[in-house]
């Protein structure tokens, strides 16, 4: 898989489905749900959305995964809210936006402090405020979408495509 320009290889977006097997007694039902989900998604418009801050190391793989997931849909959009990154995240997102008109990036310097990971109230309020930015954008521009799927943009292992379909 390469970038739309064709010269930069993107990471393999494959998810190690075999490392997370379905319980044997649920296998038949799971396969049925995946099959039905594949048909439903193929007829649907989906908005994938998420937050990004200093996620440059994971962003090429996230991009590849979202493009692969988007290919399962009749149509899709990606809405990413980025703020206060100190790495190459804004540049990578701007390049993705230039390469693909389905990608919508809100990038801004808010001066928000870095808060430690965890469940602290201040961090949750900060994340909620940023989340509301992409919800507003979706309401303004993509309210005809059939589904909205929130993604973590910094997951090293990605997400299960079969799980998405189920």
Model-found features: residue ranges?
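Short beta-strand-to-loop acidic/aromatic patch adjacent to the donor-nucleotide binding site
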Residues: 142-156
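Conserved donor-nucleotide/metal-binding helix-loop-beta segment in metal-dependent transferases, i.e.
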Residues: 155-166
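N-proximal low-complexity "stem/linker" segments adjacent to membrane-targeting elements
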Residues: 2-68
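Short beta-strand/turn micro-motifs composed of small residues
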Residues: 52, 82, 152
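Short beta-strand/loop segment that forms part of the nucleotide-sugar
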Residues: 75-84, 107-108
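Short, surface-exposed basic-aromatic patches at helix termini and helix-loop junctions that form
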Residues: 68-71, 94-99, 165-166
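Active-site-proximal specificity loops/subdomain of glycosyltransferases
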Residues: 88-145
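Preference for well-ordered, secondary-structure-rich cores of eukaryotic proteins
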Residues: 45, 61-63, 67-70, 77-79, ...
